[in-house]
Regions:
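Mid-to-C-terminal Rossmann-like scaffold of FAD/NAD(P)H-dependent oxidoreductases
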Residues: 2-10, 29, 291-388
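Short hydrophobic core segments
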Residues: 14, 105-115, 243-253, 309, ...
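C-terminal auxiliary extensions adjacent to catalytic cores
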Residues: 361-423
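Rossmann-like NAD(P)H-binding beta-loop-alpha module
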Residues: 142-198
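Beta1-alpha1 glycine-rich phosphate/pyrophosphate-binding loop at the start
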Residues: 2-80, 176-197
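FAD-site-proximal beta/loop scaffold in flavoenzymes
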Residues: 127-152, 157, 230-236, 241-314, ...
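A Rossmann-like FAD-binding core segment of flavoenzymes
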Residues: 36, 81-98, 105, 179-274
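Glycine-rich Rossmann-fold phosphate-binding loop(s) that bind the pyrophosphate
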Residues: 15-18, 135, 164-167
């Protein structure tokens, strides 16, 4: 009948982390008038910038500054926000989800953005008090409270805080605690830091830079057992080493929250499997963020997740198929005074032409890896000013044969020595 408006589609988003928050932004940029949007999140507050937890711990910013979406944000945009609630099951035949409160919420289209959880380590007695993960605002709040009272009772220990994990998150957590005046020791099972982004030489430069910021390191070792009755007293290592400590932060990576989707019969192994348009094996369910698996890969950095949000928003709002591509992403470290950049391949092989500049006194190490006159990897520490230029050359597969001798000297040198295209070549093109 004329005059009747088309019924809105019920769009239900499970999860309210960074992926869900960015996806909402992308929806609103387009047109959500055809949707009745509901967001369910297990944390009480709205979406916040999780990658800024390290600066909050370090005291370089505060909690209000990283809350991107307070409750009023959802209300003002006509979005229903159900906070502090978990989804326990997906009932695909009925097209509804069952919540931890026993309620059922219907959907026409479901988006899973349930993120990930901290990876576990094979150590005994992890139930002791003062052993934390570093994943949520609650984690940071507990660490800050502990840091404020780290000298309680005058207890003497080898270190105030033990951080497990030499990846980006572990290094940033260690730095934040050190800024609070705690004596920090970081343990990493590899022989060098950031071993998935840096070569051993760069890892050594990074270690020295962080030691200057009052962080100690134990490398090529693992915690096998925590000691204490109720509260943490110390840690025992596989090597036989023992260390007394007051608190521990475990930051050894993430595990995708795939269980909700897989229990409902969705396909996946490492995560909930999606295609290039973020669709799962059920046409009524999509997924994005750290919970997904795409061509065998999972995701922990924001850049590819932002692209996933664009891809899904285009498909749902405009029925435009803009395929997601898992492109290279550079690594940067959020530690004040430590300039680090890594992209692409980082371990030299016989296939590479290696360009290296080192200045031990200044703490500068710059390495480029070339294959067939194209940059395939860049590792910079101490001076990362040209990182984005190198990354652009890498992604564009630019032929750098003419400027290779000048690449490590900096932009002014390699741009000056780059040969302009001749007029004959231009006309021929």
């Amino acid at each position: 009948m004329a005059g009747l408006s088309k019924a809105k589609q019920k769009l239900l988003i499970v999860g309210n982390g960074m992926a869900a928050g960015r996806f909402l932004d992308e929806l609103i940029k387009r047109d959500i008038s055809g949707f009745e949007v509901t967001v369910i999140g297990d944390e009480r507050q709205g979406s916040y910038n999780r990658i800024m937890l390290s600066p909050v711990l370090a005291g370089e910013t505060d909690v209000p500054a990283i809350i991107g979406k307070p409750s009023s944000w959802y209300r003002d945009r006509g979005i229903r926000f159900v906070s502090g609630v978990q989804v326990k099951a997906i009932e695909r035949e009925q097209k509804c989800v069952l919540t931890s409160e026993g309620n059922r919420l219907r959907y026409d289209h479901l988006v899973l953005a349930v993120g990930s959880r901290p990876a576990k380590i094979p150590a005994e007695n992890q139930q002791l008090d003062n052993i934390y993960s570093f994943r949520t605002l609650r984690d940071v709040d507990r660490l800050l409270n502990k840091a404020r009272f780290h000298e309680m009772h005058g207890r003497k220990t080898d270190t105030d805080a033990l951080v497990i994990g030499g990846g980006l998150l572990g290094l940033e957590a260690a730095y934040g605690l050190a800024l609070k005046g705690l004596r920090v020791t970081l343990v990493h099972r590899s022989g060098w830091l950031l071993n998935r982004q840096l070569d051993p030489t760069a890892g050594g430069y990074l270690k020295r830079a962080l030691e200057a910021k009052n962080i100690d390191f134990i490398l090529s070792d693992e915690v096998s057992r925590f000691t204490g009755t109720h509260e943490l007293k110390g840690a025992e290592f596989k090597s036989g080493r023992e260390l007394s400590c007051k608190l521990c932060v475990i930051a050894t990576g993430i595990t995708p929250n795939k269980e909700l989707g897989l229990a409902a019969g969705l396909k996946g192994e490492r995560g909930v499997a999606v295609n290039a348009f973020m669709a799962t094996s059920d046409e009524s369910i999509s997924a994005l963020g750290e919970c997904v698996e795409f061509k065998g890969d999972t995701f922990g950095l924001v850049e590819p997740i932002w692209q996933q949000c664009i891809t899904l928003a285009e498909r749902l709002c405009h029925n435009i198929k803009l395929p997601f591509e898992n492109n290279p992403v550079p690594t940067k470290l959020k530690v004040s005074g430590v300039n680090l950049f890594s992209a692409g391949e980082y371990l030299t092989t016989d296939e590479h032409r290696e360009l290296i500049y080192q200045d031990d006194k200044a703490g500068i190490y710059r390495k480029l890896l070339l294959r067939d006159n194209r940059i395939v990897g860049a590792v910079l520490i101490g001076d990362a000013r040209d990182g984005q230029d190198y990354f652009s050359m890498l992604t564009e597969k630019k032929d750098v044969a003419e400027i290779a001798p000048f690449l490590l000297m900096g932009r002014a040198f390699y741009q000056t020595n780059e040969q302009p295209q001749s007029s004959d070549e231009t006309e021929a093109a």
